[in-house]
Structure formats: structure tokens, C-alpha cells
């Protein structure tokens, strides 16, 4: 399922998470939400969504030795994060914001393979 952008101000907060999750209680749920701050602020405390996919950070288009200034704004800025049974994946994307420039934060396309643990 997907929701409208829901980020920290000045970004909009228009996600209708409750409406989006209606009727999904017994299903494995995957949420697409643009901003990773939505996970800690709304998804973790209010839902049992299994996997959230986010982007937004672009790793601020620069990483050095695996670190980025985006860490200061986004606790979850790149990669896989787990909290209990809930998982967040943040993709740093392929584009840019502002200047058409990337250094170390090379464009990323992610392929996730989901497997049923019950065989």
C-alpha cells in the first residue's frame, strides 16, 4: 500500500495511514511512504506494518567512507533498519535535489526478495 508524503515540517503530512491499513490486519503488509521519518513517528507506534519502503534522503548526494551528513537529519537515512518485527528500507535513489551532482552516494536501485518463512 502507499500513502501521500508524510515528513517532518516543512514537508507535508498528508498520509492517511489508518485508512490505508484498514482490512490488512491478518496480511503481511508493505507500505510505501516517501519520507523515512514517517516510520518512527507514525508507523512504529501506531501500526503493525511489516515492511516500509522509503526514500527522500538521497544521502544528501554525498557520502564519505559510508557516512553522510543526512545522518544528522534522518536517523534512518540509508539501508535496512529493524525494530522488533517491523522493518524499514531506505533507498538513496537515483536522482538529485538542486545541483545535478553525487559523490559517493551513487545511484541505487534495490531489488528485494521476499520469502515465506513457512515452507
Feature-to-residue mapping (PLM):
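Soluble catalytic domains of enzymes that build or remodel membrane lipids, polysaccharides, and related
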Residues: 1-119
Amino acid at each position: 500500500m502507499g500513502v501521500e508524503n508524510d515528513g517532518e515540517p516543512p514537508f507535508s503530512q498528508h498520509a492517511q495511514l489508518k485508512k490505508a491499513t484498514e482490512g490488512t490486519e491478518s496480511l503481511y503488509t508493505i507500505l510505501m511512504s516517501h519520507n523515512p521519518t514517517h516510520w518512527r513517528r507514525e508507523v512504529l507506534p501506531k501500526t503493525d506494518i511489516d515492511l516500509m519502503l522509503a526514500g527522500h534522503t538521497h544521502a544528501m548526494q554525498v557520502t564519505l567512507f559510508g557516512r553522510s551528513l543526512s545522518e544528522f537529519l534522518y536517523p534512518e537515512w540509508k539501508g535496512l533498519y529493524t525494530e522488533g518485527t517491523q522493518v524499514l528500507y531506505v533507498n538513496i535513489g537515483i536522482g538529485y535535489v538542486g545541483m545535478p551532482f553525487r559523490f559517493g552516494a551513487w545511484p541505487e536501485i534495490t531489488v528485494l526478495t521476499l520469502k515465506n518463512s513457512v515452507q
